[in-house]
Amino acid sequence: MAAKKSFKIKQKLAKAKNQNRPLPQWFRLKTNNTIRYNAKRRHWRRTKMGI
């Protein structure tokens, strides 16, 4: 990744960074909740974003 990034690329990276986190614990305790973990988790080395 270049040191000089366009604003569009920087926005994409920021969004990906925010999405890449586990579920909050309080969310798992909600009634009738079937979601156990974040299925869309991304590892920086295993899966590249393609930008």
Swiss-Prot record:
Basic residues composition-biased segments: 1-15
GO molecular function: structural constituent of ribosome
Region (Disordered): 1-21
Transmembrane segments: none
Keyword Ribosomal protein: yes
Disulfide bonds: none
GO biological process: one example: translation
SUPFAM superfamilies: Ribosomal protein L39e
This protein's GO CC annotations: cytosolic large ribosomal subunit; preribosome
Keyword terms of this UniProt record: Ribonucleoprotein, Ribosomal protein
Entry's family note: Belongs to the eukaryotic ribosomal protein eL39 family.
Quaternary context: Interacts with YIH1.
Protein name: Large ribosomal subunit protein eL39
Organism of origin: Eremothecium gossypii (strain ATCC 10895 / CBS 109.51 / FGSC 9923 / NRRL Y-1056) (Yeast)
